[in-house]
Amino acid sequence: MCIRDRANIACGLLPHVNFMDKITAYSTLRFIAGIGLAGELGAGITLVAESLPKELRAIGTSIVAGFGLLGAVVANFTVELSGDWTVAYFIGGAMGIMLLIFRIGVAESGIFKEVSDDKTLSKGNFISFFTSKERFIKYLKCIAIGLPTWFCIGILAFLANEFSDELNLSGKLNPGKAIMWAYIGISAGDFLSGIISQWLKSRKKAIFWMLVFTIIGVLLMLFSSYTSPSMYYFYCVWLGLGTGYWAMFVTVGAEQFGTNIRATAATTIPNMVRGMLIPMNFLFYYIISSSSSKVIAAVVVGVIAFSLAIYSTLTISETHNKDLDFIE
């Protein structure tokens, strides 16, 4: 947290930096902030999952992630209302410091305390995901479930301006707005995913039907007839709502593994998914260079991402109401 918040505040001071290239400085600071942020969601989800009764885990983790992902929306509005992008970094850094102060008073879960007291038990061992075939396959499936979220955010929203001409829209798309609307949908979807999971009494069914909902949105975004950029932003909300199972996906990852490596799973799985955006982007641009069609490129990448996610969702073990008091 300290690393992330200091890097954010430093980003707000960049206009006053004259001793080095501002782009290099910004890239370096965002990398540092990313390191500080990388494990926060997974650690928070793990703490909530281990602290709440199993009947309330889905609701609790969804609320945590739902409010957390609203940060991207608040940041965009902060810039628009203040007219100065540096203000968003100052506010974000200050809020992070406040969160750090609140975090000091949060107690560890009883399950974790029992494991941490056992000096003979291996804890937080990342290599352990690769020492067992069953555990490794389970780890890969957890990663695959999250791929559609970053396909929608990293390609359809972040690269929205790439699709303006091919979709014959009446105006240019703004990637910043596309991301903002997508995150509004994701935040709402995160809240809903917990409710849907409780209603269906299944993590797998909740994620599966949200994936189906997202696929419909992707097809409408890329193939339906419309000319207004506003409709593209509407579909960004749709895709965000569908891929709002992000909290549920991290929760499933946490629930799959024992207490001694649960936090490691919950922090590394979402980061592995984010990292998979690199090969997805590479494939996207490679197909464009071959076919010149951005829509076809998006469809190919999307088919791969959604196929892997659906297969993994259907074949991974159900964790609804699972007792988390176990070790690997």
Where are these regions (language model features)?
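C-terminal ends and interior cores of transmembrane alpha-helices
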Residues: 4-19, 212-226
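Extracytoplasmic gate region of multi-pass secondary transporters
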Residues: 135-189, 277-281
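Hydrophobic core of transmembrane alpha-helices in multi-pass small-molecule transporters
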Residues: 7, 22-38, 230-244
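Cytoplasmic membrane-interface "Motif A"-like loop-to-helix N-cap segments
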Residues: 4, 55, 199-211
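Cytoplasmic helix-loop-helix junction between adjacent transmembrane helices
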Residues: 29-66
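Glycine-rich segments within core transmembrane alpha-helices of 12-TM secondary carriers
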Residues: 56-80, 95, 267-281
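C-terminal transmembrane helical hairpin of 12-TM major facilitator-type secondary transporters
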Residues: 204-248
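Helix-to-loop junctions at the C-terminal end of transmembrane segments
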Residues: 190-202
